[in-house]
């Protein structure tokens, strides 16, 4: 009985969402910010190392973390900083609730770091 109950619970767990594909829009960006928008252009997201603070904020707003995105702005996290963040930085340094912080790190920060390393190691 307990096993079937657990199986039912775990059957409801969804896989993490995939990262949206992004493109760069440099027009009308007087503050030096790289515009981030959903797109399949280039077949991959632009290098997050080039993102300004507002690009990081807009990325997290776009992927559904509207409330938490402001923490990246308050802490002045640009793309280079984002790529250097550890799990502990996200869980404690941004002063976010644990649930969203875990999702932000596991489903977004870590994959962005992995893609950046993969794209820049070859």
Curated annotation (Swiss-Prot):
SUPFAM superfamilies: SAM/Pointed domain. PROSITE patterns: SAM_DOMAIN (PS50105). InterPro entries: PcG_chromatin_remod_factors, SAM, SAM/pointed_sf. It comes from the Eukaryota. It holds the Pfam family SAM_1. CDD domains: SAM_Atherin-like. Residues 51-119 form the SAM domain. This is Sterile alpha motif domain-containing protein 13.
